[in-house]
Amino acid sequence: MISAFCPGHVTCFFQPITSLDPLSAGSRGAGIRLSLGTTVKVNPVPGNAMVTKVNDGTGSDDIIRKVVRSIDPSGGYEINVRHDLPVGQGFGMSAADAVAVAICMCQITGRSKTEAYRIAHVADLLGGGGRGDVAGIMANCQQPVRTVAGIPPFGKVEDFRVNVGRVTLAVLGSPLETKDVLSEREKYVDIRNAGSDAMQEYLERPSLESLFKISNRFSAEAGVRSRETDAAIEALEEKGFMAAMCMLGNSIFTNAPVSEARSVIGDVWAVSCNAVPEEAGIIRTR
């Protein structure tokens, strides 16, 4: 049995980029790597069946299966996945799943970690998950900025040494499907244009304050905020905190402590975590 942990990743703003080569596709954008994420256990078993269990057994395993079969088309495996954060709320759980499973599978089959990231990126992208979370996770810095779309070395991720520290994540509504949002042509164009402007502005003056400010301008111009998200951001800002929407979810990230965030926006699901540079990797082998 092999176990791996992968950090989650919040995208703050993004510019979707398409390409015939999935390794060069994804998005430009800025994000935050999280101390909470996904823990995966992979156990090779006789035969060719794949049995997966995600959290309480109700989670989707489509991207996990894509990763496994990209590496071993016919082997038998038992796979257990545990999420620290909700799925479909912009916390990068599908990407973290893909990376953690790919690292385990590549360890089992003697492949490199670089190959694991490439496989995870393609599976997450084609499976309708994140558009750049895997590249952000691969960067090993608190606040990765994806200046060129795709997975390195095709894409490029830079570290501008922005210290994020501790953040609170709060969920305000039902999950969103990234693929559903981006499938609307008009919405896609709005997001792409807003993302291009956001990237240009952020690269001129990267800082924690501008990360929140530009994230809010992006979500407003792209038209992706729900009423609940909009109200929560406004309420926290009125109390002197910074807050912005997680892409793409009915959720926010803020510098307000959990207790103070809840006192402002209500008794919602919320958790505090750190922005971290530590890489994803194997945590146990047997």
State what each model feature region is:
Residues 91-115:
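DPxDG-like acidic metal-binding loop motif
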Residues 1-87, 273-274, 278-286:
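ATP-binding N-lobe of GHMP and related small-molecule kinases
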Residues 74-84, 118-125, 228-239:
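Short, hydrophobic/aliphatic alpha-helical segments
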Residues 4-6, 22-23, 31-34, 127-129, ...:
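Solvent-exposed alpha-helices and their adjacent loops that cap or buttress functional pockets
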Residues 114-158:
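Alpha/beta catalytic cores of group-transfer enzymes, especially the acyltransferase/condensing modules
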Residues 154-286:
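C-terminal nucleotide
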Residues 10-16, 38-43, 133-138, 142-145, ...:
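Short beta-strand scaffold segments in enzyme catalytic cores
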